UniProtKB/Swiss-Prot annotation:
SS bonds (residue pairs): none
Protein keywords: Plasmid
Record-given protein name: UPF0337 protein msl9551
Highest taxon, organism lineage: Bacteria
Organism: Mesorhizobium japonicum (strain LMG 29417 / CECT 9101 / MAFF 303099)
Similarity field: Belongs to the UPF0337 (CsbD) family.
Gene3D superfamilies: YjbJ (1.10.1470.10)
């Protein structure tokens, strides 16, 4: 997985992230700024799930994007 691609294109990607994780606010997404660890933490917080689950969910989402 090449997360640099997500981070480098965050302005374009954050809409897709918002579609997947609608509980994340625009402010959350602006603060995350493409940083995977921050995205994991915010998903964990907003959805009340374990960090490992957030990590797996992000991996699944990323793989479905076809990048």
């Amino acid at each position: 997985m090449d997360w640099n691609r997500v981070e480098g294109n965050w302005k374009q990607v954050k809409g897709k992230v918002k579609e997947q994780w609608g509980k994340l606010t625009d402010d959350d997404l602006d603060r995350i700024a493409g940083k995977r660890d921050q995205l994991e933490g915010k998903i964990q917080e907003r959805y009340g799930i374990e960090r490992d689950r957030a990590r797996r969910d992000i991996d699944d989402w990323y793989n479905r994007q076809g990048w």
